[in-house]
């Protein structure tokens, strides 16, 4: 018998059962586990909601990856699913067969369904796949563990998405038996009141990534600080102030103290991104000294680092193992760069990505950091475009970066000699200068992906942003 034959038999058996929903419901307790995923898909596709409700109560696997089936919110089906869960939660003794620990609403486990539909060989069971997701998050103890609903939160508008609103309301009255878990929470523009309501619903220990793009007002800083202190497993924090808010001198110290103290509780923080956050100018050391564990990523962009801020960076153990450093679009023109050199020396063995884009670094400033830069032997990405550098300065820079054999992406400004009086590139001047710079570099190594001048992808026009996890299309090379 071919591999597809038993799959076809399972499919036919499921379809036959669903023709009589009452029969399907009555036999679920005796239904072989192998039939559950296929029958669930058939019931979902056919919108046999009563069957879905009962199947949830008898689900024989630790995880129900509903999100990979439900590509768009379907409130009717969600109502039946949670009704089934409610029936179970209301029972003092859980059914023998019930193993459900996680309702997965993210689109992360499509393999669970495709394996049992016959789309690919059965290399591992759904139970094994489900356990990979749930063992770490849902350790079994002697007492009943709360059911966990996993979903990501992305808040772009004034109103909340239908599925998030639905689960928030459902979990609100079941806090002891159901946890709404969101590994990633992103707020682009939602007002503070609605954002607060969401944070109060989400189980704080589940949040590993928090991005806030509208950190514009003191009240938002205060609210975020209060909830941030509860996110004990936070790995990545991104905060951005689109308004460029600058507090009064009297309130600045209070904001800094309140926000910095939160970091004492974030033991697992690895990535810190601060974009246009100006209320830390001159007070950065207060935040850095509160970091409990070594960071892998530090991004301080579109801000105005002053000299005191830069001075503190080399001296704290929490910055001694950086893999990514981004100081782009900051004002370094009038600041001594000896502290930056000291920091680069300190992280030379670990640093992989360095962004110094549009920092106002001229030839004299560049010479200060070159010896330390040439020691960063594991550097794979170096972005330096947007700075005011002469041809001689770039030659010197390439002689130092030429020693970095692991570089796979490097961007440099057009030499000052190729610009007109408005700072625009004159291509007729840039071309021969670029050829000379490439010759100098090739004397040491063959570059992989390298750009000179205003950086944009020749294929799609994209350019690296101030964020380190940019998607940069590099299917072609400049001529």
Swiss-Prot record:
Lineage top rank: taxon: Eukaryota
GO molecular function, one term: ubiquitin-like ligase-substrate adaptor activity
A GO term from the CC aspect: cytoplasm
This protein's record includes keyword Secreted: no
Keywords: Leucine-rich repeat, Repeat
Gene Ontology BP, a term: negative regulation of cell differentiation
Family: Belongs to the PRAME family.
PANTHER family in the cross-refs: PRAME FAMILY MEMBER 19 (PTHR14224:SF76), SIMILAR TO PREFERENTIALLY EXPRESSED ANTIGEN IN MELANOMA-LIKE 3 (PTHR14224)
UniProt protein name: PRAME family member 19
Stretches forming LRR repeats: 15-38, 97-124, 179-203, 204-230, 231-265, 266-291, 292-323, 324-342, 348-375, 376-400
Keyword Repeat recorded: yes
């Amino acid at each position: 018998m071919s591999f597809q034959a038993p799959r076809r038999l399972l499919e036919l058996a499921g379809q036959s059962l669903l023709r009589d929903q009452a029969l399907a419901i009555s036999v679920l307790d005796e239904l072989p586990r192998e039939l559950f995923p296929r029958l669930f898909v058939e019931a979902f596709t056919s919108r046999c909601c009563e069957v879905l409700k009962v199947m949830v109560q008898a689900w024989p696997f630790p995880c129900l990856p509903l999100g990979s089936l439900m590509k768009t919110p379907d409130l009717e089906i969600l109502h039946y699913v949670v009704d089934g869960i409610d029936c179970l939660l209301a029972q003092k003794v859980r059914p023998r067969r019930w193993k459900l620990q996680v309702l997965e609403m993210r689109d992360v486990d499509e393999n669970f369904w495709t394996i049992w539909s016959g789309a690919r060989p059965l290399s591992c069971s759904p139970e094994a796949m489900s356990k990979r997701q749930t063992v770490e998050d849902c350790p079994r103890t002697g007492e009943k563990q709360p059911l966990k609903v996993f979903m990501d939160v992305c808040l772009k508008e004034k109103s909340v998405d239908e599925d998030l609103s639905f689960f928030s309301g459902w979990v609100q009255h079941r806090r002891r038996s159901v946890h709404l878990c969101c590994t990633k929470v992103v707020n682009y523009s939602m007002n503070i009141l609605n954002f607060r309501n969401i944070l109060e619903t989400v189980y704080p220990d589940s949040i590993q990534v928090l991005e806030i793009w509208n950190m514009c007002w003191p009240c938002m800083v205060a609210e975020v600080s209060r909830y941030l202190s509860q996110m004990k497993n936070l790995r990545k924090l991104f905060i951005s102030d689109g308004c460029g808010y600058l507090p009064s001198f009297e309130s600045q110290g209070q904001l800094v103290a309140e926000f910095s103290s939160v970091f004492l509780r974030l033991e697992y923080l690895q990535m810190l991104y601060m974009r246009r956050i100006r209320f830390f100018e001159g007070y950065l050391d207060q935040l850095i000294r509160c970091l409990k564990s070594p960071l892998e990523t530090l991004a301080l962009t579109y801000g105005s680092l002053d000299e005191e801020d830069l001075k503190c960076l080399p001296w704290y153990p929490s910055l001694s193992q950086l893999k990514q450093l981004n100081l782009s679009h900051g004002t370094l023109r009038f600041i001594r760069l000896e502290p930056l050199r000291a920091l680069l020396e300190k992280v030379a063995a670990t640093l992989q990505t360095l962004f110094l884009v549009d920092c106002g670094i001229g030839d004299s400033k560049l010479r200060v950091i070159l010896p330390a830069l040439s020691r960063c032997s594991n550097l794979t990405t170096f972005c330096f475009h947007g700075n005011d550098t002469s041809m001689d300065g770039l030659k010197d820079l390439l002689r130092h970066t030429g020693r970095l054999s692991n570089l796979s992406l490097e961007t440099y400004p057009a030499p000052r000699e190729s610009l007109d009086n408005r700072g625009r590139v004159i291509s007729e001047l840039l071309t021969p200068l670029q050829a000379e710079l490439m010759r100098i570099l090739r004397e040491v190594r063959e570059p992989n992906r390298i750009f000179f001048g205003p950086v944009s992808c020749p294929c799609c026009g994209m350019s690296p942003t101030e964020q380190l996890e940019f998607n940069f299309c590099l299917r072609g090379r400049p001529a």
